[in-house]
């Protein structure tokens, strides 16, 4: 308890400093843009998504289920964002892109890549018992005002294959360790399609910290609403390591515009302190 209080006071002290340095990161499952969702179709939700991004103002955010025309819309209607990522079907534009967006006003992209969650990670492929091809996109980013470097990884685990979820996340965990010999701070976001008590999260919990659990100001709401107001399953996550603390974790349940939902997943975001 004493250690927790000291840690809490340290984060609060950092936040009270006028030269506070940190990263606001978001995970947002946009919902597949070609789905027949009626009143919840992308064309009716896309403006609300832009309003949400303008309101929250993440330094970087990872999206899931994004198709190229959804990415293009976000780029065209927001300021100062660029993105990296490839389509999972061909390594170019086809299929879901595990895109990472970053603000050019606060961050500089130094390197990036995408790999497939499969036995052949360098090529478009489906792994184990997965229903779909799954990928992870990683970036090495520089925080301009502080000069600090950090890695950011974004992924989407399979919704059907239990083995694919376990092995896919295991691959991500191994890569997180091997890709970072300089021990830079690290962020992982994604739709993991598992609840917090799922055993497949145990290897990740050993090397990284859940922002939901660690935040000074946290949020108990679930993230997957399935177009229902009274529903909220926790299947979307933000993990971190190498940061001094997490000041905030929030599930974005506010309405933006006239649409009932901006997606079948509520966006989640965290404020991480260097």
Locate predicted features.
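Active-site-proximal beta-strand elements of phosphoester/diester hydrolases
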Residues: 22-34, 98, 110-115, 148-158
């Amino acid at each position: 308890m004493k250690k927790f209080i000291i840690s809490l006071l340290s984060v609060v002290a950092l936040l009270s400093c006028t030269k506070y340095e940190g990263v606001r990161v978001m995970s947002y499952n946009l919902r597949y843009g070609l789905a027949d969702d009626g009143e919840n179709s992308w064309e009716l939700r896309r403006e609300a998504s832009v309003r949400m991004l303008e309101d929250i103002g993440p330094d970087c955010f990872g999206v899931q289920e994004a198709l190229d025309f959804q990415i293009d819309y976000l780029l065209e209607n927001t300021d100062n964002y660029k993105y990296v990522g490839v389509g999972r079907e061909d390594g170019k534009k086809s299929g879901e892109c595990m895109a990472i967006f970053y603000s050019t006003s606060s961050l500089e992209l130094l390197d990036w890549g995408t790999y497939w969650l499969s036995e052949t990670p360098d090529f478009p492929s489906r792994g184990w018992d997965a229903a779909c091809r799954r990928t992870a996109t990683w970036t090495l980013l520089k925080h301009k005002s502080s000069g600090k470097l950090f890695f950011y990884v974004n992924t989407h685990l399979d919704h059907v294959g239990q083995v694919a979820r376990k092995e896919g996340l295991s691959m991500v965990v191994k890569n997180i360790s091997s890709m970072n010999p300089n021990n830079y701070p690290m962020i992982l976001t994604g739709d993991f399609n598992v609840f917090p008590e799922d055993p497949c999260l145990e290897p990740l919990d050993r090397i990284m910290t859940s922002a939901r659990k660690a935040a000074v100001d946290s949020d108990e709401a679930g993230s997957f609403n399935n177009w229902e107001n009274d529903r909220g399953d926790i299947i979307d996550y933000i993990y971190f390591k190498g940061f001094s603390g997490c000041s905030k974790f929030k599930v974005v349940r506010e309405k933006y515009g006239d649409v009932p939902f901006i997606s079948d997943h509520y966006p989640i975001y965290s404020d991480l302190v260097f």
